Amino acid sequence: MPEQSVLPWDADGPQSILKGEDSMYNPTKPIDKEVLDGYNRGVERGRLHTGIGLIELARTKELLLERLPKPPAVLYDIGGGYGEYAWWLASLGYEVHLFDLAETNIRLSAELAAEYPGVSLCAAEVCDARDVPRPAESADAVLLMGPLYHIPEKAERIAAVRESLRLLKPGGLLFTPAITPYATLLWATSVFGRDNRLIAEDAFMRMVERELTDGEHIRPPAAETAY
């Protein structure tokens, strides 16, 4: 959870996105089918329990515990996958509602119940982060820790953030990660080390250039590349 605006291009910070014409930010574009298909294959299950995912899990939990209000606060975990954080937070006494776009993730979340005997979620529902079926000012905190990097268009990202802000009670907290525009370039040049040849691929470098200029990570067609 970086200590910066979730919308770095907006000098007035996240609250300023509530200004202006509503029609400008209506969520009309569906999430890319490739993204949804991937999650419906269960690719997220177990990711946080291996490799660098272990660091992500531990650090995220640390930051959440530092900043969340005390239980039994109402938390909405939007785009929360199969509920790794949702179930953990519920075990701490929070009233947790889990939402995810992938039906498979919601089904998988039921499997975690066995790891938390006597614990339950208030809800586990399929929905879009830009249209959450809950009343305004009904959550003490919203976790929006997955959806934004799957929504490359600025207006659609704003729609997702506006929806989270709508749900928050006055003084509520919104948690969302930020990914540096240099992430793909750093991934290519450090994770694979000296054997990596991605920076010699035109398609890869075009993708990186777009990330650095527009802040949008748009993968080339699968036939061209695997990244």
Language model: regions and residue ranges:
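A short acidic, Gly/Pro-enriched loop at the edge of an enzyme's catalytic core
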Residues: 130-142
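A short glycine-rich, Lys/Arg-flanked "PGG" loop and its adjoining helix->strand segment in the class I
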Residues: 158-170
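Conserved class I S-adenosyl-L-methionine
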Residues: 24-79, 84, 88, 173-209
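A short SAM/SAH-binding and catalytic strip from SAM-dependent methyltransferases
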Residues: 141-155
